[in-house]
């Protein structure tokens, strides 16, 4: 069965990401491993590392339950704050052959920090794997 590595945070659970995952499922059985990078934004002036990690874990669990309820086979983990490092770290542990590709879900160009960092292209260059880039809208967690 094909597996896809999905990296998302603010767009995790968006209709656009769900559609991209379903498109892969339409091509045959597959499963998804979600990686939610720790995100240092949001309400509040300061966040501790444990608060950031807990927020990412909560966001991950809500998305995992939602995707599973919609019939998708999903596992997941919290990753490094950098989406590139988060993907590379998972591939170091599991191996590149464990995944058919990477789905990167970002905010729209006008507001995406990940796109300013060229994250989808950097993930492709660093991994040599096919990358599907999805532009989604933020989901309130």
Show where each model-derived region lies.
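Structural motif
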Residues: 3, 100-103
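Glycine-rich, Arg-bearing micro-motifs that act as flexible, cationic patches
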Residues: 105-121
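Acidic/glycine-enriched edge-of-secondary-structure segments
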Residues: 2-9, 62-81
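Glycine- and acidic-residue-enriched helix-capping/strand-helix junction motifs
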Residues: 47-57
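Positively charged, small/polar-rich N-terminal and surface patches that mediate targeting and assembly
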Residues: 31-32, 53, 69
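Small/aliphatic-rich secondary-structure junction motif
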Residues: 1-47, 129, 133-136
């Amino acid at each position: 069965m094909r597996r896809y590595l999905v990296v998302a945070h603010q767009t995790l659970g968006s209709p656009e990401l769900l559609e991209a995952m379903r498109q892969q499922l339409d091509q045959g059985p597959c499963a998804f491993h979600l990686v939610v990078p720790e995100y240092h934004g949001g309400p509040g002036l300061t966040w501790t590392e444990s608060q950031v990690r807990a927020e990412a874990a909560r966001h991950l669990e809500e998305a995992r339950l939602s995707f599973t309820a919609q019939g998708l086979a999903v596992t997941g983990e919290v990753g490094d704050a950098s989406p590139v490092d988060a993907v590379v770290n998972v591939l170091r542990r599991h191996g590149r052959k464990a995944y058919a590709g990477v789905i990167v879900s970002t905010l729209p160009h006008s507001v995406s920090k990940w796109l300013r960092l060229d994250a989808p292209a950097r993930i492709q260059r660093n991994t040599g794997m096919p990358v599907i880039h999805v532009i989604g809208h933020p989901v309130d967690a």
